[in-house]
Amino acid sequence: MAVAGSWQPPRPCEVYRAEWELCRSVGHVLHHYYVHGKRPDCRQWLRDLTNCREWEESRSAEAQRSLCESEQVRVQAAQKHTLVWALRQRPPTDWNLPLPQEKDK
């Protein structure tokens, strides 16, 4: 059981800073724009970084609550996507047979 004053942010503040900087990087912005058609929204990473620093400085309960909620939203967003491919339980029976040769044209 954790002691009341021993709570730590889910991630170190350096991780929030690195994620925020990555989100703002040119390569990430271009990739995100290419894939999604819009610029990435990096405000949540900045809010998390600010809350993490506030927690480290003043042990603010509001910052703690905000960080916990933000991480829960991230976990739920990652879990909502279904797998594209059906996972195999075992390889196909003919996996070791030679591949069919291309037909002559």
Swiss-Prot record:
Disulfide bonds: none annotated. It is found in: Synapse; Synaptic cleft. In the postnatal brain, expressed diffusely throughout the hippocampus at a low level at 8 weeks (at protein level). At 16 weeks, strongly expressed in the stratum lucidum of the hippocampus (at protein level). In developing and aging brain, expression is strongest in hippocampus, especially in areas CA3 and CA2, throughout the dorsoventral axis. GO terms for biological process: negative regulation of long-term synaptic potentiation; regulation of synaptic plasticity. The keyword Secreted applies. Keywords: Secreted, Synapse. GO terms for cellular component: synapse; synaptic cleft. InterPro entries: Pants/Emi1-like (IPR021475). Rapidly degraded by proteolysis following neuronal stimulation, resulting in increased AMPA receptor clustering. Negatively regulates long-term potentiation and modulates adult synaptic plasticity. Stabilizes the interaction of RTN4 isoform A/Nogo-A with its receptors, inhibiting clustering of postsynaptic AMPA receptors at synaptic sites. Upon neuronal stimulation, degraded at synapses, reducing RTN4 signaling and allowing AMPA receptor clustering at individual synapses. Interacts with RTN4 isoform A/Nogo-A; the interaction results in enhanced RTN4-mediated inhibition of AMPA receptor clustering. Also interacts with NCAM1, RANBP2 and CCT8. Belongs to the UPF0545 family. This is Synaptic plasticity regulator PANTS. The lineage of its organism: Eukaryota, Metazoa, Chordata, Craniata, Vertebrata.
